[in-house]
Each structure stands twice: as structure tokens, then as C-alpha cells.
């Protein structure tokens, strides 16, 4: 979005966002992450520059995935949101849905929640025709397999020759007692 706005600090500029309350909550979260970050590149920035914040692409590296999702959802300019979604061969509602699913999945993993046979409360959206087919329409959208398919979809889009399928297969082989059908 920095490229479209010509503003390397767009992420902290309220003019680009639709909901002021959501923007203010986002800024509080950004402040917390920035002020407590121990990342070398953030420490270098603080010691080298006078700006209150680093450029948006640096902030994006330290803020939680859920905050990135809310930033995307709050972008005022729908054309920019559409352009970002099209980078992943998706439309806006599907990208928002999938970002939320990935965030929930990530949070469950980080908090050691059981995920392999869990039924999620969220029902992810699915587009009719995928440019990069991976997810079938008969898959239960509330199970971890669908979340893994979404992650694999993004991996295939960003890093086409990734080894996620191999690693997942190895993981499942390591734990043969897991009922794959429950996923």
C-alpha cells in the first residue's frame, strides 16, 4: 500500500482508514509492539532515525497477524483493497475471510489449543473458481484441513515450490494415532 499511496508511513496515517475507532485501537497495538520490540532492525531504527515510527513495511514485520488483518479490513480505498486481494488471485471478502481463518488458526497453535479435530465457529468463504486450485468445495470449511488448504494456497501463491505438503505429510506420519478424517 505504500506504493499506491506514495506514503511509507501510511499504516499510521488516519486518512487512509475508514473507521477512526478501529484505527485508534490499531495505533495502540502498533505502539505497544513497537515500544517493546527487541528486533535488531527496530532497535537500529530507533537509534538511527528521529521519526516516531519506522516505515510501514518495518511495522508490518512486528505487528500481530490479527492487527494486519484489521488494517486491511479498515483500508478506506476499496480499489486498494481490491488490488491487494488480486495479488493473491482472490476477491476482497474471500481474502478477509481467509486472513481471519489464518489468524485464528495461528492463535490456536500459539496457545497450544487442540486443532486437529476441532470444529471452528467461523465459516470461511470459498470462491467459485480458484486460479490456483487446491481447495475443493466439498471440504468442511470449519475444520483444520480447510485452514491448512488456505495456508497452502497462500504458500503456493507466494512460494510456488514450497515443501509444505511434504512437511505436513511427515508430521502426520510421525503421529499415526491422529484420525485424519477428523481433520
Map each language-model feature to its residues.
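Long, contiguous internal "core" modules enriched in hydrophobic/ aromatic residues
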Residues: 1-183
Amino acid at each position: 500500500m505504500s506504493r499506491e499511496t506514495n506514503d511509507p508511513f501510511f499504516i499510521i496515517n488516519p486518512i487512509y482508514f475508514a473507521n477512526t475507532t478501529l484505527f485508534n485501537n490499531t495505533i495502540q497495538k502498533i505502539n505497544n509492539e513497537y515500544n517493546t520490540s527487541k528486533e535488531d532492525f527496530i532497535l537500529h531504527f530507533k537509534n538511527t532515525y528521529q521519526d516516531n515510527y519506522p516505515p510501514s513495511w518495518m511495522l508490518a514485520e512486528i505487528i500481530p497477524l490479527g492487527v494486519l488483518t484489521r488494517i486491511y479490513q479498515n483500508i478506506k480505498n476499496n480499489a486498494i483493497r481490491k488490488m491487494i486481494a488480486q495479488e493473491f488471485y482472490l476477491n476482497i471478502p474471500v481474502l478477509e475471510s481467509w486472513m481471519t481463518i489464518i489468524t485464528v488458526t495461528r492463535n490456536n497453535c500459539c496457545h497450544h489449543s487442540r486443532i486437529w479435530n476441532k470444529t471452528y465457529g467461523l465459516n470461511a468463504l470459498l470462491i467459485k473458481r480458484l486460479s490456483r486450485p487446491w481447495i475443493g468445495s466439498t471440504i468442511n470449511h470449519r475444520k483444520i484441513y480447510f485452514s491448512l488448504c488456505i495456508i497452502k494456497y497462500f504458500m503456493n501463491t507466494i512460494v510456488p515450490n514450497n515443501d509444505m505438503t511434504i512437511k505436513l505429510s511427515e508430521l502426520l506420519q510421525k503421529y499415526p494415532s491422529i484420525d485424519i478424517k477428523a481433520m
